[in-house]
Amino acid sequence: MEHLKYPIGLFEAPSFNLQLCSIWIEELRQLPGQMRGLVEHLSPEQLDTPYRPEGWTVRQLVHHVADSHHHSYARFKWALTENRPIIKDYNEKNWAELEEAKSTDIEPSLLHLEAVHLRLVRLLESMAEEDFKRVFIHPSEPDPISLFENTGRYAWHGKHHLAHIQRLISREGWAV
């Protein structure tokens, strides 16, 4: 079950590396198109299929990624404009269980993901090396999170959920 839950493994933050940051920014740039390419032709029944037993549906995953990356974008801006801000956490599981996340068409979330990533990538590309060392405080994390780490975490997060959907499509033999 663990391989279904974490198909690309857990995120492990490496030491600061500006070249790695550039790779992550490119992955973030590509994520909305990759997500759209995977899900835009799925039927409503396929969108409502859980990616694993007791897991979210594809529809919930799409809405979750849009919600989560919106939060991440705000965290970058807080950390760039405030000194060690304490960010507001949210219960992603509860958000995904809202009827809206279970039944709304995915197109608004795909458009939102595209818009957020346009802004996020532009913000990341405008940052100086020292900016990536700025931090925010996450209430459920023991250590401050640097913007370098957050960049990697969200590049990983996108690939993590793309892998959930890709593997489901492959297991089910769905045409893409």
State what each model feature region is:
Residues 1-30:
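Terminal targeting/low-complexity segments that flank the catalytic cores of oxidoreductases
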Residues 26-38, 96-134:
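Acidic/histidine-rich alpha-helical segments that form the ligand environment
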Residues 19-54:
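Short, contiguous, helix-prone interaction/anchoring segments in small proteins
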Residues 1-12, 48-93, 121, 135-176:
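Short, contiguous alpha-helical
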Residues 38, 42-45, 83, 127-130, ...:
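A short secondary-structure junction motif
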Residues 20, 27, 53, 57, ...:
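Alpha-helix N-cap/loop-to-helix boundary motif
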